Amino acid sequence: LKRDGNANVVMNNLFKLTQLQSMFSINMVALVRGVPRQINLRDALVAYLEHQVEVITRRTENRLKKARHREHILEGRIKALDVIDEIIKLIRASDDVAIARDGLMSAPFEFSEIQANDILDMQLRQLTRLSRIDLQTELDELRLKIIDLQGILDDPDRLNSVIKDEITVIRDKFATDRVCELTYDDG
């Protein structure tokens, strides 16, 4: 180093001869829609976002299916509370489970097979302890959840909002300040 030396030359020599600056190439090959492709960073991010849309859509559809199933069971339990004495008489008078199920599915009860199986699977003490208020509260909360889940599936902006929220959580959990600078080199 000399006093009258060019600072740019010195810096370039430091970058070249030391590990002050490192350059390396990346061969990014990824499956995009099931096809292997060489992609750049932008394409990788777009593919990730498309994947997130698919994941959140499937997850929401699954949660919606489970919520609708639970709603159907709760409707059956609330309906069963109105005729609990007749249901107990029918179950006691039946010779086996199949006859009791058929009786619950026919007039005057007309429960679905899922609801009838749920009622038959419950123990007698559970049938008597069912609280209409608790069941109705759970059903109301479940219906709000169903509306919310259906809203996510129906509205692309809402779906994007969910993706944004989840990515923000990931960013907050794993964020560290970048130590080095990423640059693009044509050479």
Please tell me what each predicted stretch does.
Residues 1-187:
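C-terminal interaction appendages of subunits in large macromolecular complexes
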